[in-house]
């Protein structure tokens, strides 16, 4: 019967996962493979190539990667954003890191694919989310003046995209920049581990410290919207809130002394609530 067939398919998924686990892959790699498998099944269902009474993944939980704690202290972040460098290599590394931070923690793949010819705002859907769902959110974020200066420095006016005059594949370019960021951090005397992703994690951390709501931080980061029922007006509100959030986080980095009293008061309130 179809019921027994569905049970068998669910067992097959679990057996497949057990087979992959024997390869001693990391949880991150196993999670990627199983998510891709689920995506293939979902697309087949959507195209009516297969049908199930019960989804094969209903009893299987995809392993989650451990959260990478690569956020850095405000002082370290400020050193990188304001670093004076004497090589093109470190200049590119610093500017890409800075752009990620100034644009709400944007991922490198989305940043490199962005058309910046509209100088006031960027609009995109995260590639990482687009690969998992057909309902990917469109994110609209302001281009802060600090980001605009960097964009003007590197943008190809014909394509609107950043052009660093490297003839690398994206994968090799990403590795090249990662090494550059690590080298820059070392030269600046930063002891923490610093990677491109640190800009994203640190933006989220500072925004949280300032009391910016999680929903607004998620919007800036481009996290998928699980509600799926967001009306147009609400989306417009999120855009404005995101603009305020980004401006406030950048102002906090530039003028931390302005926020000292607020942060101390907020810490006291959080302590009383705990």
Give the residues covered by each predicted segment:
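Short, basic (Lys/Arg/His-rich) helix/loop patches that form interaction surfaces
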Residues: 86-87, 178-219, 223
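C-terminal secondary-structure termini that scaffold catalytic or DNA-interacting sites
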Residues: 145, 158-159, 167, 228, ...
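Basic, Lys/Arg- and aromatic-enriched nucleic-acid-binding interface segment
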Residues: 27, 31, 52-108, 112
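Short, polar N-cap/turn motifs at the start of nucleic acid-interacting alpha helices
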Residues: 116-122, 191-192, 212-235, 256-267
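Conserved tyrosine-mediated DNA breakage-rejoining catalytic core shared by Y-recombinases
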Residues: 112-150
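Active-site/catalytic core of tyrosine-dependent DNA strand-transfer enzymes
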Residues: 144-191
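Short, small-residue-biased leader/transition segments that mark boundaries at the very start
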Residues: 3-8
């Amino acid at each position: 019967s179809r019921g027994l067939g569905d049970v068998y398919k669910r067992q097959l998924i679990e057996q497949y996962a057990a087979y992959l686990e024997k390869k001693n892959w990391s949880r991150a790699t196993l999670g990627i493979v199983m998510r891709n498998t689920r995506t293939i099944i979902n697309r087949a269902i959507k195209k009516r190539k297969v049908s199930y009474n019960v989804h094969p993944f209903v009893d299987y939980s995809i392993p989650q990667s451990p959260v990478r704690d690569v956020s850095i202290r405000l002082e370290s972040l400020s050193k990188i954003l304001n670093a004076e460098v004497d090589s093109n290599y470190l200049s590119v590394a610093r500017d890409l890191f800075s752009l990620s931070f100034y644009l709400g923690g944007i991922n490198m793949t989305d940043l490199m694919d962005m058309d910046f010819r509209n100088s006031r705002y960027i609009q995109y859907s995260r590639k990482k989310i687009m690969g998992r769902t057909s309902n990917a959110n469109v994110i609209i974020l302001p281009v802060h003046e600090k980001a605009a200066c960097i964009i003007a420095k590197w943008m190809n006016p014909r394509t609107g995209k950043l052009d660093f005059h490297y003839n690398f594949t994206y994968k090799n370019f990403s590795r090249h920049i990662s090494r550059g960021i690590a080298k820059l951090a070392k030269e600046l005397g930063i002891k923490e581990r610093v990677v491109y992703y640190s800009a994203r994690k640190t933006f989220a951390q500072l925004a949280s410290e300032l009391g910016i709501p999680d929903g607004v931080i998620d919007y800036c980061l481009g996290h998928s919207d699980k509600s799926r029922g967001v009306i147009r007006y609400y989306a417009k509100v999120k855009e404005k809130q995101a603009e305020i959030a980004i401006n406030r986080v950048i102002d906090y980095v530039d003028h931390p002394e302005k926020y000292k009293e607020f942060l101390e008061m907020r810490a006291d309130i959080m302590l009383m609530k705990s």
